[in-house]
Amino acid sequence: MHIYTYWGLKYVPSNSTMVAKEGDLILLGNEVHKVVKVLHRFRNITDLQITNWKGTETRYNLHVTEYKVLVPYDTHKEENEAMSDSLITHNGKDYVLCKIPARVGDLIRTEDKRVWEVLQKSKDGLVLYNEEKGEQRSAVYSEIGPYHVLVPRDTDTHTPTREELAAVIMNKAFTRTETQDSQEDTGTHKGLGLTGTDLYHSLRDLDAKVQSGYYTATENEEDVKSEIEATKKHMKAVKESGKTVNDYRKEENTKRCKLKALTNKFNRLFLKSVIDTDSLQVGKAYLIGGRDMKNVHGLYTGTTFDQQHANFLIVETDRMHRTLTVSAEQLFAEERHIVDIEKRVEQTED
């Protein structure tokens, strides 16, 4: 498998024939080593931004038929060479197949290509339901075998900018609903160092998703509408307060100092051989530290299949990133600690 690098991030070709969307990176069929970005698309007529050793150029009105969509590649996943190695469509929706532990409410695909909904989860196995045949069964993990979790593919996927990568580390930039008793992540920015442009983009994206029917459930639509109104009020309050970006940065630095003091005292007990995945959320930022290392912000990307190691994406610049792996033994021996940044900030404010 060939690995392609685009602005410092690694990608591999998808195994499926997924239709490219605006903002996607694709690999042209007749030019094996040319990675291009889709700017606009109308049927097979496409505007492409081409980046190679000669520089960057834009070509308009190209007739593109043979291509493959590129998906993120995680160099530290031995069991699953590509963390998101294929894209599939189920019930009219696009999903990314990821090898991460399933939770209640998730859709999973087993080796026989069947899709199941997770109704219940225990330490021994899962209770599954297949909508296609109306079949429900309980099975231990050994009977289920290897499986992939279906993670919804965002409709506005695009190559992240430096500002967006920073937002992922400092804010909740991913939307994911976990088990009923867990905290829901709605992707709301907390206002830490945000500019008017950040708030405008958040408002525009949410409004567009409501208008396009991206949120189909009534309760979700109401939640998004209320979030849009809350964002408008927040923008108005920021404007009236007269605060500058530097003022927000000072507040952010104050909270960071409080976090630094808290991390010296904070030690969470984990199981000796298995990562406590119920306390970690894919796509969420955590503070990782321990003996002989400085505290760093990392984006949790999942665990190995045996759940003995947790992987975190560390974004250093817009062209450089690395993966940090934390083992269950290190957590049990208190050589490493993982701090939920937002939870600690909320407790500090209370």
From Swiss-Prot:
List of residues binding ATP: A237, V238, K239, E240, S241, G242, K243, T244
GO molecular function, one term: ATP binding
Keywords: ATP-binding, Nucleotide-binding
Protein name, as recorded: Gene 40 protein
Lineage of producing organism: Viruses, Duplodnaviria, Heunggongvirae, Uroviricota, Caudoviricetes
